Amino acid sequence: MSHVLSTGVASPQEASAFFEAQLAFRTDPADLAADLLAGEAAEGGSIVVIDTRSPAHYAEGHIPGAISFPHSTMSPTTTQGLSRDKVYVCYCDGIGCNGSTQGAYKLAALGFRVKELIGGLHWWRQDGFAVATGSEAGVLLEGGIACAC
């Protein structure tokens, strides 16, 4: 008996709905980099990238254009200045870190539209994208690898 088929297979309609739902919750480094290069995170753009780690870790290296907003500080009061017209992309260190999940959860619970960056800063770096350092957001320049998918 097939191990792959031992649990059954979803119908094409069920599979389509499942995978569409996954894409509604997550994005990957290549798609985020493309949006950053296209100006989607600039003033007037449609997304805001949030580094959910501590300010010290943000200063050591972060995605260019990201703002530092530790998940532990997110509350109705601290999010008052956030626009409800934006989509917030949360990230943390990556595998083994749930800061991005906690940040995304808190923002969603407060009524914001949000996505989580798959693999966090680890996969961002692994894909060859540059990081900014210090307390300023910085700007992404050309670089990284093209997604092979």
Give names to the regions the model predicted.
Residues 36-39, 75-84:
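Short amphipathic alpha-helix with an adjacent loop that forms part of the alpha/beta core around
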Residues 67, 84-85, 131-135:
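Short, hinge-like loop/turn segments at secondary-structure boundaries
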Residues 66-73, 111-117:
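Short hydrophobic/aromatic-enriched beta-strand-loop microsegments
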Residues 43-49, 64-65, 87, 113:
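Short active-site oxyanion
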Residues 32, 51, 66, 107:
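Terminal peptide-recognition signature
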Residues 58-64, 79, 124:
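Short loop/helix-cap segments at secondary-structure boundaries that form the rim of catalytic
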Residues 1-48, 55-60, 134-149:
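Flexible, polar/low-complexity N-terminal or interdomain linker segments that lie immediately upstream
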Residues 79-125:
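Catalytic cysteine-centered active loop of the rhodanese-like fold, especially the PTP/DSP P-loop
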